[in-house]
Amino acid sequence: MSVETQKETLGFQTEVKQLLHLMIHSLYSNKEIFLRELISNASDAVDKLRFEALAKPELLEDGAELKIRVSFDKDAKTVTLEDNGIGMNRDDVITHLGTIAKSGTADFMKNLSGDQKKDSHLIGQFGVGFYSAFIVADKVDVYSRRAGTAASEGVHWSSKGEGEFEVATIDKPERGTRIVLHLKSGEEEFADGWRLRNIIKKYSDHIALPIELPKEVAAAEGEEKPEVEWETVNRASALWTRPRTEVKDEEYQEFYKHIAHDFENPLSWSHNKVEGKLEYSSLLYVPARAPFDLYQREAPKGLKLYVQRVFVMDQAESFLPLYLRFIKGVVDSNDLSLNVSREILQKDPIIDSMKSALTKRVLDMLEKLAKNEPEQYKGFWKNFGQVMKEGPAEDFANKEKIAGLLRFASTNGTDGEQIVGLAEYLARAKEGQDKIYYLTGETYAQVKNSPHLEVFRKKGIEVLLLTDRIDEWLMSYLSEFDGKTFVDVARGDLDLGNLDSEEDKKAAEEVAKSKEGLVERLKTALGDSVAEVRVSHRLTDSPAILAIGEQDLGLQMRQILEASGQKVPDSKPIFEFNPSHPLIEKLDNEASEDRFSDLSHILFDQAALAAGDSLKDPAAYVSRLNKLLVELSA
């Protein structure tokens, strides 16, 4: 080893100290994952070199054959992993091995479940896989040199995984990174060729470059140990380039875990090769659970992009719409240029064609999952339903297909679970029903007891109950499904069409005519608080209700605008009353205009509360109510 210069001792960032403590003391039940993580990092380093060497072939120096080597020394109790990838300079080493993004650490800690097996798989997802070395090692040495720098600019990083690390400059003729793990007492099992071989086959068989181990050759008695011969122990071919019939489910699952840094198997996957005008292969996965940053718009998303099997970029966002940002996978194109950039991807017509086809493939995969595995789809919807609801606004071409994948709670259920699809809703619709009825609100408890549903309960008509914040916005982009229009049961003048008999309609007209005087009195009493007063066809049990104007914003949208600091357009509700309710009959017979006004305002405020709205003047409501209670108790 060359002489070390510019040696300095630095302290780990606080977050790294916490992480190291966690690695060493908490994740000991699944120790072998250290090798999976280090191989995954080495594979990324080789991918980066391949990509940078497209523009600068000299980076390959004299070693064009890219590989990872794993070796061990039983006597010294060490395991060594070496790659000839991009390598690191001094700054890289300090940055990557001494600090990690604070947000990443916080999220990592927050996501720990206490289940050691699950937690051990989280480490790759948060970019902290290197530190898993300390699960089995009490000291780690890293020797690295970045491709394109002088041999004298190598760097040696060393740490015992406690509070600090040492960095020194060394001579390192070969580019890339060598990691030496000094195994803890009791971890000698890993200094064994068969053990390492089995771990590599188990976790890293899909890695698309050779992972080599020394051949197990026993020296004859009295002979010198033969020179080390290396042999490739993984399959070392890009999984997506192989015929589907040759790839086992277990291989697809392990590959998913590698690219997604997930510990669970995916729910579903689609492996496809397109030939003809466009030529590309794709392997797309639906995860079983949502990533921690699903709702952070700036979070990394997109597919791994390869061009003619050469890695080009992670998180290529242009191949799928934003509402499918949870999909993981790779796309390998023969038609794109190797020097393609993110900017070019956004403008290339080839990408538009690929995006359209890949989007359809994902939606087909989800349709198949919903049809064949309804329980699994239920789990998918819990994790990704709100993101899927962004689809109709973003993807007009596939609006009907996306609508078929949506799931809602309904009046047929009892617990608010979103399990009703639109096709299922229509399949059990009443004879003559030509509309899909829905109601939006803040909570399931609030909407399921809403007075707006009274006439629907009486007639046995199912209503979809929409309580996600995004729902009212979603419905502004969904006008119909399978030829049936959507109707908000709280909006406008409710018309049940064929579901109301001619006798019902005639009787309603007669009642409305007989209550014209009461309508006028209520208009006068409520004044500017309402846009209109009318007899209700919605109510059977409640005295009054507030309906929304046909063009007005509902409560959900108003709250979203208010929360984002935007101006909310002025609107007034429609006050509807139930002519057969005893309170309304009493109100109609009230001679005192002052008392009539008080009762009218109490009914108006109660209707607002039932709709989930807040009162503009709670003190006035309480005062009127107290006054009424005093009169009643006198």
Swiss-Prot record:
GO molecular function, one term: ATP hydrolysis activity
InterPro entries, alphabetized: HATPase_C_sf, Heat_shock_protein_90_CS, HSP90_C, Hsp90_fam, Hsp90_N, Ribosomal_Su5_D2-typ_SF
Source species, domain of life: Bacteria
PROSITE patterns: HSP90
Keywords: ATP-binding, Chaperone, Cytoplasm, Nucleotide-binding, Stress response
SUPFAM superfamilies the record matches: ATPase domain of HSP90 chaperone/DNA topoisomerase II/histidine kinase (SSF55874), HSP90 C-terminal domain (SSF110942), Ribosomal protein S5 domain 2-like (SSF54211)
One Pfam family of this chain: HATPase_c_3
Sequence segments annotated as region (B): 343-559
Main location as per UniProt: cytoplasm
One Gene Ontology CC term in the entry: cytoplasm
Subcellular location per the Swiss-Prot or TrEMBL entry: Cytoplasm
Keyword Mitochondrion among UniProt keywords: no
SMART domains (alphabetical): HATPase_c (SM00387)
Region (A), start-end ranges: 1-342
Keyword Transmembrane: no
Region of interest (C), ranges: 560-634
Family label: Belongs to the heat shock protein 90 family.
NCBIfam families per the UniProt record, alphabetical: PRK05218.1
Function: Molecular chaperone. Has ATPase activity.
SUBUNIT field: Homodimer.
The name this protein goes by in its record: Chaperone protein HtpG
Species lineage: Bacteria, Pseudomonadati, Pseudomonadota, Gammaproteobacteria, Pseudomonadales
